[in-house]
């Protein structure tokens, strides 16, 4: 902890994301802070939270600064889906009760509900069905939200996406590596996992580290 340097972190990944960026760092430290109270955790959490917010341009859009032009996306790995799944985990564990971020539990739930509605309105659909980059990650969010809050997901939206996925051949287009590889995050293993999770209440979310 004494050697932690935020400038080095900024140079390495100046973007908000659960898998690779500030959101993942914040979530890890919130877990650590719950187990071992340490002011140094709180300091880094607050700094990372500020930096994540500085990348937010509008509702559910965080700029990815790895490229000069900067862009936002809705992927799990480095976009809004992963960020909001992490926040769903925060809500479940009531992490905001442990630290003052200027963000209340009520505001968090409102954002989580609004993101659910954004997904179900089809505003952030893609032509990809992988867990890392596609629509099935969005469905994973809806499943987790329903199981945590009891607020039902829109089955018409789910049916629409599943029907479209079948027509599109469960395409993992534009994912790194081969289209429709057998991999979990960008391939057919992950697609089958999501279908199984939708049909079985006892399967937890891989995308939320099996915490939802």
Q: Which sequence ranges carry the predicted segments?
A:
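Acidic, glycine-rich loop-and-beta core segments that form the ion-binding/anion-interacting portion
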Residues: 25-76, 80-86
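Solenoidal tandem-repeat scaffolds enriched in leucines and small polar residues
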Residues: 1-43
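Terminal, non-catalytic domain-edge segments
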Residues: 31, 86-102, 110, 114, ...
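Glycine- and aromatic-rich loop/turn segments at beta-sheet edges
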Residues: 1-16, 53-74, 112-133, 164-181
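An internal, amphipathic alpha-helical element
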Residues: 76-78, 84, 124-148
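Residue-level recognition of alpha-helical structural elements
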Residues: 14, 37-41, 97, 101, ...
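Periodic glycine anchor positions in long extracellular repeat architectures
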Residues: 21-24, 79-82, 134-137, 187-190
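Short acidic alpha-helical/loop segments enriched in Asp/Glu that coordinate divalent cations
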Residues: 40-44, 61-64, 93-107, 129-132
């Amino acid at each position: 902890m004494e050697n932690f340097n935020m400038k080095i972190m900024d140079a390495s990944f100046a973007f908000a994301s659960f898998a690779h960026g500030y959101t993942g760092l914040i979530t890890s430290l919130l877990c650590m802070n719950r187990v071992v109270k340490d002011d140094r955790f709180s300091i880094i959490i607050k700094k990372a939270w500020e930096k994540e917010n500085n990348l937010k341009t509008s509702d559910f859009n965080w700029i990815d600064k790895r490229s000069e032009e900067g862009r936002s996306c809705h992927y799990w790995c480095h976009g809004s889906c992963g960020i909001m799944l992490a926040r769903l985990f925060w809500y479940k564990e009531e992490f905001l009760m442990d630290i003052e971020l200027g963000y209340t539990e009520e505001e968090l739930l409102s954002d989580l509900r609004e993101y659910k509605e954004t997904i179900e309105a089809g505003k952030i659909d893609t032509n990809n069905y992988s867990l890392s980059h596609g629509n099935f990650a969005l469905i994973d969010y809806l499943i987790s939200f329903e199981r945590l809050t009891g607020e039902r997901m829109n089955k018409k939206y789910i049916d629409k996406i599943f029907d479209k996925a079948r027509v599109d051949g469960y395409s993992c287009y534009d994912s790194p590596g081969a289209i429709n590889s057998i991999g979990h995050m960008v391939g057919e293993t992950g697609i089958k996992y999501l279908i199984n999770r939708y049909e079985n209440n006892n399967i937890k979310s891989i995308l939320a580290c099996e915490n939802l």
